[in-house]
Amino acid sequence: MAYPFQLGLQDATSPIMEELTNFHDHTLMIVFLISSLVLYIISLMLTTKLTHTSTMDAQEVETIWTILPAVILILIALPSLRILYMMDEINNPALTVKTMGHQWYWSYEYTDYEDLCFDSYMIPTNDLKPGDLRLLEVDNRIVLPMELPIRMLISSEDVLHSWAVPSLGLKTDAIPGRLNQATVSSNRPGLFYGQCSEICGSNHSFMPIVLEMVPLKTFENWSTSMI
């Protein structure tokens, strides 16, 4: 999860987030190299009065600064498209969970079970227990099995919301009248926090998301106790 004064990304917990982290580093290195080259050229222009007459009208230079940016854009676009298709690909999900956004709480329905659904509200600050996180704890966590592909169907009952869990690389808009889907998969057990990431009204900041990823056997015991 995030912590105060954090500069980097949250620790990746899903394969998608690992790919996004690698793509971020890849793109950042390209930006760093281009910025260094531009700053070097600017410093030369400011500190010297020398000019190269052939650079004012040179076919070779014009060819290079046309082809090189195209190559750089391709190096950025190809891995980006690969990750984009990976995020949309859902093959044989082990479980499907329907998520509905409301003003200002989330409701969850496990569609593979006959009667397993609940609402998830933020716990008020006055009701927090020692060790709980302010504005992030909920009364009903969504419990999912780890190391299995899970399909999330996301929509909204009223206004625009966005269901986001950064450490899992998830951010999907909840739009009234439209059903979006996302894949959830975790490499390890634990608690993973998120929040509504679309301004949806006066209590937008009070719509936390808490995912509890557990082993399959633990999930089966939990689902049995909830039905």
UniProtKB/Swiss-Prot annotation:
Catalytic activity field: 4 Fe(II)-[cytochrome c] + O2 + 8 H(+)(in) = 4 Fe(III)-[cytochrome c] + 2 H2O + 4 H(+)(out)
CDD domains xrefs: CcO_II_C
Alphabetized GO MF terms: copper ion binding; cytochrome-c oxidase activity
PROSITE patterns: COX2, COX2_CUA, COX2_TM
Membrane topology, as annotated: Multi-pass membrane protein
Protein name listed in UniProt: Cytochrome c oxidase subunit 2
Subunit structure: Component of the cytochrome c oxidase (complex IV, CIV), a multisubunit enzyme composed of 14 subunits. The complex is composed of a catalytic core of 3 subunits MT-CO1, MT-CO2 and MT-CO3, encoded in the mitochondrial DNA, and 11 supernumerary subunits COX4I, COX5A, COX5B, COX6A, COX6B, COX6C, COX7A, COX7B, COX7C, COX8 and NDUFA4, which are encoded in the nuclear genome.
Keyword Electron transport applies: yes
Binding site for Cu cation A1: 161, 196, 200, 207
Protein source organism: Rhynchomys isarogensis
Co-factor binding details: Binds a dinuclear copper A center per subunit.
Keywords per UniProt: Copper, Electron transport, Magnesium, Membrane, Metal-binding, Mitochondrion, Mitochondrion inner membrane, Respiratory chain, Translocase, Transmembrane, Transmembrane helix, Transport
Top-tier EC class: translocase
GO cellular component, one term: respiratory chain complex IV
Family of this protein: Belongs to the cytochrome c oxidase subunit 2 family.
